[in-house]
Regions:
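Structural signature of Gram-negative outer-membrane beta-barrels, strongest in the C-terminal barrel
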Residues: 1-117
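Outer-membrane beta-barrel translocator domains and adjoining extracellular loop/strand segments
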Residues: 2, 67-74, 79, 121-129, ...
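Intrinsic disorder/low-complexity detector
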Residues: 10, 16-17, 70, 95, ...
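Extracellular loop and loop/strand-boundary signature of outer-membrane beta-barrel proteins
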Residues: 23-31, 79-85, 132-138, 182-192
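Short clusters of hydrophobic/aromatic residues that line enzyme substrate/ligand-binding pockets
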Residues: 62, 67, 86, 121-122, ...
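Short C-terminal domain-edge/linker segments immediately following a structured domain
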Residues: 75-76, 89-93, 128-130, 141-145
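Short, surface-exposed, polar/charged, turn-prone segments marking secondary-structure boundaries
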Residues: 82-89, 123-125, 136-142, 178
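Gram-negative outer-membrane beta-barrel transporters
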Residues: 106-117, 135-193
């Protein structure tokens, strides 16, 4: 801003017209976030006949760690400090699924059931009592259970007609709270899941 850029012109201190960010957020601030490790994925498929395929999958995934702009900001009670860098969050997924052609290949029905565990879930938090900027933290552990499927039906008695549909049912839950905030509560569902 003009006050921050020119308000200190000729002043003997650099905090004459506003806040000196070096003083506000003093401390060891990393300038990089790095991640290393190994993730695995394994799948098994079985085709009992020409019309069916069954599969099972085990997979792992993660989102890399990241830096927080307002790292070092604290809440009024001094009990929480925004971390400068946050860790990866890790997901382990178990899935069983099927792909079928039924009724003389006029009905295709695909689906899956799955269970996923997330550790150290990265969450974006806005708490103006701490800072007026969004920040991220490893806020919780969570579980996701679900079933999903889709179908395509082309009845032979009605040439040109195709009926399609899909469904998805999710049950999500926060199983452990790591960051003390009102945005993340034990037992709540995951947002936008």
């Amino acid at each position: 801003s003009a006050a921050g850029s020119f308000g200190n012109f000729g002043a003997t201190t650099d905090n004459n017209a506003g806040n000196n960010l070096d003083t506000l957020f003093a401390g060891p601030r990393p300038d990089t976030a790095s991640t290393d490790g190994v993730i695995t994925k394994a799948s098994v498929t079985w085709t009992p006949n020409d019309n069916q395929l069954l599969y099972a999958t085990f997979s792992e995934g993660y989102r890399p760690g990241l830096l927080n702009r307002p790292g070092g900001a604290t809440n009024p009670a001094g009990t929480f400090t925004v971390p400068y860098a946050i860790d990866t969050d890790d997901m382990t997924n178990y899935e069983f699924g099927w792909k079928t052609d039924l009724l003389d290949y006029t009905l295709r029905f695909n689906g899956s059931v799955f269970f996923a565990e997330i550790e150290r879930l990265q969450t974006t938090i806005f708490d103006p009592s701490i800072t007026n900027l969004f920040f991220s933290d490893n806020a919780a552990d969570a579980e996701i259970k679900g079933v999903e499927g889709d179908f395509i039906w082309a009845p032979p008695s009605m040439s040109g007609l195709t009926v399609t549909g899909a469904f998805s049912v999710l049950d999500t839950e926060i199983t452990r709270v790591i960051t003390p905030t009102n945005d993340v509560t034990l037992g709540d569902s995951l947002a936008y899941a």
